[in-house]
Amino acid sequence: MRAPGRPALRPLPLPPLLLLLLAAPWGRAVPCVSGGLPKPANITFLSINMKNVLQWTPPEGLQGVKVTYTVQYFIYGQKKWLNKSECRNINRTYCDLSAETSDYEHQYYAKVKAIWGTKCSKWAESGRFYPFLETQIGPPEVALTTDEKSISVVLTAPEKWKRNPEDLPVSMQQIYSNLKYNVSVLNTKSNRTWSQCVTNHTLVLTWLEPNTLYCVHVESFVPGPPRRAQPSEKQCARTLKDQSSEFKAKIIFWYVLPVSITVFLFSVMGYSIYRYIHVGKEKHPANLILIYGNEFDKRFFVPAEKIVINFITLNISDDSKISHQDMSLLGKSSDVSSLNDPQPSGNLRPPQEEEEVKHLGYASHLMEIFCDSEENTEGTSLTQQESLSRTIPPDKTVIEYEYDVRTTDICAGPEEQELSLQEEVSTQGTLLESQAALAVLGPQTLQYSYTPQLQDLDPLAQEHTDSEEGPEEEPSTTLVDWDPQTGRLCIPSLSSFDQDSEGCEPSEGDGLGEEGLLSRLYEEPAPDRPPGENETYLMQFMEEWGLYVQMEN
């Protein structure tokens, strides 16, 4: 009963949270008001080698707030959702469902709910997850073995996730039979990268540079739907030094180079010895100086000296004089040579330039002139030069013939001297006429070699006719045969000359009989002349022509 005048007592209301705790059975979650919080976002499965982990992000606006999460999963084809006790009221944003989704041939779903206080969010579901197609293949294990110019890469396929560490390992190669690897190689020296796809577990990289650092990383992939690849860690290895190059360098510097130098030195020594023994140091005679002309294959010889004039020394046996007839013959030969001049003296033009002097070579003539004294000899030489100068026109090229007249000592009687002088004058007239004709022909004939020979003019072996009929061609014996075209100088043997000398029967007064080839080159010293005069001429002849003459006593 209530006391009169006193109000009735009402029970105090309990807090709502306390009422929920009292009403909830012991051990059960307190129900929450759904929809009071936003849902978690980005709910996905992250699977690597069949290790399946569910991931999500916190609800919007609740970052930094202590929110708990509850996860449930669903096997495709069944009717109810299944709870995972380890993933209920957790404060992390991932849940490992590898054991619940270990059958990679099935498909799975998962959902997450956020709880904060008495408020909770609605369930946020993931998409269908197919482990066989969506799991990532982890990188293989890589082992490198280096050589001088190659690197061997050994690959080991990754293993499938194991529930218990004591379980036997299962290779991903057993699950995916078409597993392949993409190997990338980086040359750190040239900074060049190339890739190569392999299906087996061994790869040999050849044709590499020795003593060079190479870095390798490998990716595993399965042909089919695209999936993310996880590359391996970069591993680097340096190739070995090239021992063969060092060995070659040692061979070259220690064997090849010394042997080459030794062979070269011996070759130089052998060549020097051969040249010293077999290659002579002879020089051509000074008289044989080869001069080439303007035309092809036209050459001639010119003596070393410009002009050589040797006066004839006469050995007078009797006093005799040149008759008036001989002098008239000499003048007539000069007149005949002057008549051969094609241009009269009245039409001569003064030369505008100095006359060109050309040498056609020379040959030594042995001229037997029988005179009284040296004065007659000098007069004859001057007469010959004057007659030659008269036959040359001023506007033509002057031709100089160089003669080397050697001394001849002749002993003859007066009658023979007179007859020989006539023959010699006629011969000189013919020679002057031929020289004048060569001077008139022009520059074309200057290129041809002049080849008079050294002849023995034997006056006792010929017969002469009158000066009107002209001198006949005299048979002569060639003592020196010199051909300018071939450059050969031939001297007949002494025996051949002795045979020719035996065929002639000289007179008793002739001092030249049976003296041989060199009788014209030297003479026994006479009582009235120095004994070494002829030897001087012989030595000069040997020096100019480079000859070696051995005289027999």
Swiss-Prot record:
Quaternary state and interactors: Heterodimer with IL20RB and heterodimer with IL10RB.
Region ranges (Disordered): 333-353, 462-515
Glycosylation site residues: 42, 83, 91, 182, 191, 200
Major site of localization recorded for this protein: membrane
Signal peptide as annotated in the record: 1-29
Primary role: The IL20RA/IL20RB dimer is a receptor for IL19, IL20 and IL24. The IL20RA/IL10RB dimer is a receptor for IL26.
Membrane-spanning ranges: 251-271
Protein name per the record: Interleukin-20 receptor subunit alpha
GO cellular component: plasma membrane
Protein's cellular compartments: Membrane
Biased composition (Polar residues): 334-346
Segments in the Cytoplasmic topological domain: 272-553
Keywords: Disulfide bond, Glycoprotein, Membrane, Receptor, Repeat, Signal, Transmembrane, Transmembrane helix
Membrane topology per record: Single-pass type I membrane protein
Extracellular compartment spans: 30-250
Organism: Homo sapiens (Human)
Skewed-composition ranges (Acidic residues): 499-513
Lineage: superkingdom: Eukaryota
Tissue specificity comment: Widely expressed with highest levels in skin and testis and high levels in brain. Highly expressed in psoriatic skin.
